[in-house]
Amino acid sequence: DVLGSRGLGDVYKRQIFQPEKVRKNIEFIEQIKKLEPDVICVVAYGKILPSEILEIPKLGCINVHASLLPKYRGAAPIQWAVLNGDKTTGVTTMYMDVGMDTGDMILKQEVEIGENETTGELWDRLSIIGADLLVKTLKQIEKGTAPRIKQSDDFTMAPMLNKEISK
């Protein structure tokens, strides 16, 4: 089952992988295949998984993304929300596909951004919300009740910040 025979407590005993390279990484792909996972969860990883990995788990690969998709697809959604003076942001769980944060959404939770809140403070809050949303998402996937909500074509990107942007 998705959450393990002992429920949520068993989730924390799962292996965590953070390979620097996933594309054409045959050893890593074989390692994942041997695990025969029901679900692969991706959080704050920053790399697009190739179809060879996305096709492995029986119930799909899911991602926890720190924005209300389709707004702020990409590597720096929290930073862009703060830089743009947004009043709200949130967390979205979604099924992964080969695109950058383009998969079907599962759950969302919106939060207000404090007037003087820093990206670090917001990151901390969204991390807690994201963990809770991940658990809710996994429970729905296990029950077979997780929705698949298509994303609108009206999206914005949140590219990694660089020196040019800061000028």
Predicted regions and their residues:
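One-carbon transfer enzymes
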Residues: 5-167
